[in-house]
Amino acid sequence: IPGQYSLQQNFPNPFNPSTEIRFDLPSDGYVNLEVYNLTGQKVKTLESRNMQPGFHSVIWDGTNHDGEKVSTGMYFYTIQAGTFYNTKKMLFLK
């Protein structure tokens, strides 16, 4: 079990067609992991549920909440778990 919360840089980055996002949870709790575009609009929710402590990873397939491929560009992914909040950038290239 990890000793602290963390959000790692996605890999690969830049990516196409998909990328892996890893995060660590030292305790169980509700996790919200979301992708946003440069204008701050939510593109997709990757996780929104109670999760157990441990080392986790999620694959984002470069689609929005309607299942459509997103445009080339910079995206942000954010995690909120308890009092932990973090944001990182990733680049989708077609």
Which residue stretches match the model-derived regions?
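Extracellular Ig-like/FN3 beta-sandwich strand-entry sites
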Residues: 28-30, 53-55, 72-74
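Glycine-centered coil/turn sites that cap beta-strands in beta-rich domains
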Residues: 1-37, 45-48, 57-60, 81
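C-terminal tail/sorting-segment detector
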Residues: 68-94
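Generic structural signal for well-ordered beta-strand positions
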Residues: 43-44, 70
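Signal that preferentially marks extracellular ectodomain short beta-strand elements
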Residues: 58-70
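Short coil/turn motifs at beta-sheet boundaries
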Residues: 14-16, 53, 70
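Short, flexible helix-adjacent loops and helix caps
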Residues: 48-51, 65
